[in-house]
Amino acid sequence: MSLGLVGRKCGMTRIFTEDGVSIPVTVVQVEPNKVTQVKTVEKDGYNAIQVTTGFKKRSNVNKPMAGHYAKASVEPGRGLWEFTVDAAAEYQVGSSFDATMFEAGQKVDVRGVSKGKGFQGGVKRHNFATQDATHGNSLSHRVHGSTGQNQTPGRVFKNKKMAGHLGNENVTIQSLEVVRVDAENGLLLLKGGIPGSVGGDIIVTPAVKS
């Protein structure tokens, strides 16, 4: 993973091109990402940059984390994130990055935690087809049906698609276009939708695929 930015999903809107074409965009607010630690191969076994963003009241920060932030001379943020880089020595503790890291037209990958939908059945969770609505069928309209065979193998195979918890997992959307960068307000406008609910943390990195 290359160096990226941590932002917060604000919601969706649309903007118009000069030709009058409507483009759906997701607005991501990017507050300054401040470097709290630089990890190197010699000391930590790998090269990485640890950053924080946002604000957290000092009364909500425990002593170990307060010491960690104080060592970096950085105000406590709402969390810590890490980006692996090729040359960590190029970065300094206390430096910061903002939305100007990206430019309009650039392709980016976006990671977030999808909306949790609780315990769901096979029809909604795995797009199973429903059974007959009539013709003698009762109580089994949305049942997923058989889950295995007989005495052999005598068990249900792992990863069998069944009802269960849906959502609330890490999701990556690749190669989204940066439509606009509002450096003054710290906003990134990304084409299309991104995972997660409004207010959720989003990680934006340069696209892996061209």
From Swiss-Prot:
It holds the Pfam family Ribosomal_L3. One of its GO terms (cellular component) is cytosolic large ribosomal subunit. Transmembrane segments: none annotated. Methylated by PrmB. InterPro entries: Ribosomal_uL3, Ribosomal_uL3_bac/org-type, Ribosomal_uL3_CS, Transl_B-barrel_sf. Keywords: Methylation, Ribonucleoprotein, Ribosomal protein, RNA-binding, rRNA-binding. Disulfide bonds: none annotated. It comes from the Bacteria. PROSITE patterns: RIBOSOMAL_L3. GO terms for biological process: translation. GO terms for molecular function: rRNA binding; structural constituent of ribosome. Residues 133-152 are annotated as: Disordered. One of the primary rRNA binding proteins, it binds directly near the 3'-end of the 23S rRNA, where it nucleates assembly of the 50S subunit. Belongs to the universal ribosomal protein uL3 family. Part of the 50S ribosomal subunit. Forms a cluster with proteins L14 and L19. This is Large ribosomal subunit protein uL3. It comes from Francisella tularensis subsp. holarctica (strain LVS).
